[in-house]
Amino acid sequence: MPFTLGQRWISDTESELGLGTVVALDTRMITLLFPATGENRLYARNDSPITRVMFNPGDTISNHEGWELQVEEVKEENGLLTYIGTRLDTQESGVAMREVLLDSKLTFSKPQDRLFAGQIDRMDRFALRFRARKYQSEQYRLPFAGLRGMRASLIPHQLHIAYEVGQRHAPRVLLADEVGLGKTIEAGMIIHQQLLAGRAERVLIVVPETLQHQWLVEMMRRFNLYFSLFDDSRYSEAKLDSSNPFETEQLVICSLDFVRRNKLRLEELADAQWDLLVVDEAHHLAWSEEAPSREYQVIEQLAEHIPGVLLLTATPEQLGQQSHFARLRLLDPNRFHDYQDFVAEQQKYRPVADAVTLLLSGERLADDKLNLLGELIDEQDIEPLLKAANSDSDNSEQARQELVTMLMDRHGTSRVLFRNTRNGVKGFPHRFLHQIKLPLPTQYQTAIKVSGIMGAKKTVEARARDMLYPEQIYQEFEGENATWWNFDPRVEWLLNYLVANRHEKVLVICAHAATALQLEQVLREREAIRAAVFHEGLSIIERDRAAAYFASEEDGAQVLLCSEIGSEGRNFQFASHLVMFDLPFNPDLLEQRIGRLDRIGQMHDIQIMVPYLENTAQAVLGRWFHEGLDAFEHTCPTGRTIYDSGYEQLIGFLAAPTEQEGLDEFIHHCRQQHDHLKVQLEQGRDRLLEMHSNGGEKAQALAEAIANQDNDVNLVGFALNLFDIVGINQDDRSDNLIVLTPSDHMLVPDFPGLPQDGCTVTFDREQALSREDAQFVSWEHPIIRNGLDLILSGDTGSCAVSLLKNKALPVGTLLVELVYVVEAQAPKHLQLTRFLPPTPIRMLMDRKGTNLAAQVEFESFNRQLNAVNRHTSSKLVNAVQQDVHAMLQQAESLVEEQARALIEQAKQEADDKLSTELARLEALKAVNPNIRDDEVEALEFNRKQVLVNLNEAGWRLDAIRLVVVTHQ
């Protein structure tokens, strides 16, 4: 093309310079000035990496003074272009604008503009962009978003609760599963779903101080949710950046004590516009009508301001109906406003639970029971269903199930309360206790005697706590370097036990970090036993490494030595041998220790080894736990209640372990109390609530559906392709593991979701569960989600040129591959993507205006193509520019029909689904007071908004590829 002074060109290799103007010419060279940056570039006349900028009728262009022109005609005179059209700010028509007056900062965002301006991308990036569009659209359509990507086993009852609650608008529920059934994971799944769906953006978690790090670790490792921990120092720092420090972060964890201590802090928290509040250990919020505790009032104030509330408690309601009412009152103060009314309602509810038990038993129903069912369900056409349920016909079972569903919908607190018990959830191992009685060394006897004399002024509780750990008393007098492990018989016993069980993984838990560290040294030096240590002084990454070292089968540690606090929130189901080097102070901590191994997914019976020194507090406590509470071999829901009522007596026995008078009677009394409460619990078992919480077959089907989506081959192929193109280094390790590290030539300098020092990933859920240091990559993982955003929100792969070697077609045959996207813009919380995700429509146009996409599948077509360098690509584009314009116009008329059909289908689906949901909720509200008005209103508003936004859906060209046939 001949050059003329004043022509506008763009650099193919430095598009950031903007539009250049030809300012000097000679026989061999041309000079371009780039006014946007003030830089000059010298190019050879032949084969320079620059492209002529030419616009076409229908384009909108910008003048250097800031106004825009809709081009209607293009004139060329002496090699210079003049654009004629309508000025958009004044609507003046017939305005002429010479190309020299074009805005130099012009950027090309439309794929066709980038193609014609020579900003052509690589062919593999075009393919990645199309796949990203296709897979993203498919993922949006799949149900269970937010449940698939968690790094946890697919346990039906957990998935059922999370799915039920996570789908609701501003859920307000009480999660009351028994210990070891995974309430934290359920809460995490609900949070994850609410965040992914856009129903929540700001989440506050309030927990006891000792559980802060456990929650932080669980949210990060299982759900890739990075919470900020707010304590006094973090609060003071944030105060410098904002008048309300809590507005500086979206996801926050803090302790109940941190909130309780300061009135201003509480007000700031309440004003910080959270969407979801999660409170763990909610049974510690003491309440009575006359005097609610300060802790209760704090949570009550927050719950009034925050739309969604999840309360977590392991205490069954039968162990304190008043405190159970208090927790429900936090969730819905209008519904649960009077305690006496609540008690009366619960008594009415008893026959409902009995009726369900009867229906499930399969026995014939007496007339009085049939009448009761008729009254409880209160439907006009219930008679045929009752007859069918009581007959021997084939549909009797189905009729009974329908009646149970009707009862579930109408009665009790099943909308706000979920509780699973170990009786209702199968798959737990047995626990076997082995107590090993060892002599008390004279060194300890002396230290305890001296301590008794010198600590006479200590409180009974302080003395009791001291007496549990004789090695600490000894060190107190002999100094920190006192080598207690040389004479403590528990150490000798532990060494022998580990040597005898060389091939077993053993978890050893002790109360203090110092004990764990000293034991590790002894094991290493005396028997060369490989041990990992796990304590609160380690960072999360160091703990991950220690846990991975313990988990590794080949060259891993035989033993993991844990301190009490260090082990919180970590589970090691692959081990089944637990050694308690000492005992914890209360039954909750004991259950927490055993719970490290006693989880769903544990394949073996658990052997609990308790070496203890005779005539010490450990011996007393061991007896009380085992004989009084049966807490070693079975979970003990009654433990906290009995501990609280017998606390004074218990610490008296622990503080003076040699004075045993009355101990047998005390233990016997506790056992009676335990048995009595257990019977009460079993009688009060709420079958209806358990069925609702467990999810039954529906929950099984949900777990299977998600399991079927695991190991998606499309994900593995796409992820590896994405890592290659983004420029992430991949180092394959054994066991399906890949180490990802940033490289120096990435598409973006700091890839979101990829740590600076890299990370280990796997696509296998089981592998991720057994390796603490491996992240589980799914379509929901931040690396994949951020990768999709990176590709699709920018221009990566939006235009390309390829050659097709095919002797069956004439040389020079031109094909244009187009990817249109049909989408609707709307606030995230409306979840329009359920009905109309950004959906690609692929077209393959020939010069005759025929769309060949249906006959030519993308992947097989892509494999036949060859890449072209950028310079040759620009030349090809310039040669066929007019043809491509004509083919684009033909495609525009064809795509409209497909796009409108997609939009209509989405509108129909949304209307059907949301109207059905609304009708069901309204029908239930008429018979169940637990459905809040705001839930119905939110669903009605949501339906209207979804349909309005779908009506405004449109389509646009997202990517274009020019394909030219060659025979070489």
UniProtKB/Swiss-Prot annotation:
Domain Helicase C-terminal stretches: 490-664
Entry annotated with the keyword Transcription = yes
SUPFAM superfamilies in UniProt: P-loop containing nucleoside triphosphate hydrolases
InterPro entries cross-referenced by the UniProt entry: Helicase_ATP-bd, Helicase_C-like, Helicase_RapA, P-loop_NTPase, RapA_C, SNF2-like_sf, SNF2/RAD54-like_C, SNF2_N
Motif stretch (DEAH box): 280-283
Lineage top rank: taxon: Bacteria
For whether the record's keyword set contains Transcription regulation, the answer is yes
Q: What does this protein do?
A: Transcription regulator that activates transcription by stimulating RNA polymerase (RNAP) recycling in case of stress conditions such as supercoiled DNA or high salt concentrations. Probably acts by releasing the RNAP, when it is trapped or immobilized on tightly supercoiled DNA. Does not activate transcription on linear DNA. Probably not involved in DNA repair.
- List, alphabetically, the HAMAP family matched: Helicase_RapA
On assembly, the entry states: Interacts with the RNAP. Has a higher affinity for the core RNAP than for the holoenzyme. Its ATPase activity is stimulated by binding to RNAP.
Q: What is this protein called?
A: RNA polymerase-associated protein RapA
Name the gene behind this protein: rapA
